[in-house]
Amino acid sequence: RQRQMCIRDRGNMVASMGFKGLLTEGAKHILGWKSPHFVYHCSQNPNLKLLLRDYKLSDDISLRFSNSTWSEFPLFAETYMDWIAAVPEEEQVINIFMELCALGMFQPLSSNILEFLKALPACAKARGISFSTPSEVIDHHKSVDALEVPYPMSWVDEERDISCWLGNGMQREAFNKLYSVADRVRICNDSRIKQDWDYLQASNNFRFMTTKSSSWNMYRGIYDSPYDAFTNYMNILGDFINRVNGMYPRDIDNEELNSLLTLIKNQ
């Protein structure tokens, strides 16, 4: 699964890495009239199957379960399985995907979320509904059609795009400054630099900077506002860049860096 189910047409690359399938969002602007309850394949590579998240049924658990103002509150396992049982019989694959932080963070344990999950298997069995892993679905179901994803897509907000990460000037400034030292980081062999580089690329660093309104309570980690997140990130990033430049000064031009990269690859 891509982080936050971000995807764009890159089927050949993913298939070349040995993957047989990809989990992604069942966004309306990509599906059009199609249903997310079938297996599809990537338009670039028919060998790469796509499993599309049913965002309503997924978000009913991960986002709305403990919301006392929700029209379906409180949600019981029997009701949830009745919704799934009501899906047309020919639509045999219903993908429920969510982050683990939905259990205990977005939905506190006091909401009885774990008891709800424990009750699901028995309620499903009583209605003739079975569970499968993504690999089992990919192995046992044929693709019904190709699906083209020409624009970046995610499972976040109504737009289902990447504007939550790169939609404002702060996010783009931080992103561009981070990757301005990418070539230098690639050629370094300092394990702490490599580790911090991975940390700095975490998608939540940029998501915490979003100024978009959200249909659910936006989790910002330790920050009170997107501006606090931006300020703290840029301070840390500035220190990181100084460390990188201490190893590979800015006056090393791209041609020299490329020569170093080529030398490393050939070793």
Model feature map: region roles:
Residues 37-48, 52-55, 67-70, 82-267:
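Active-site and substrate-binding clefts of carbohydrate-active enzymes
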Residues 61-75:
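Binuclear metal-dependent hydrolase catalytic cores centered on His/Asp/Glu-rich metal-binding motifs
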Residues 11-36, 41-52:
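Acidic, His- and aromatic-enriched active-site or binding-groove loops in soluble protein domains
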Residues 2-7:
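Short, small-residue-biased leader/transition segments that mark boundaries at the very start
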Residues 1, 23-27, 135:
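Glycine-rich, histidine-containing beta strand-loop boundary motifs that form or position
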Residues 10-14, 118-121:
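Short amphipathic alpha-helical segments and helix-helix/interface helices
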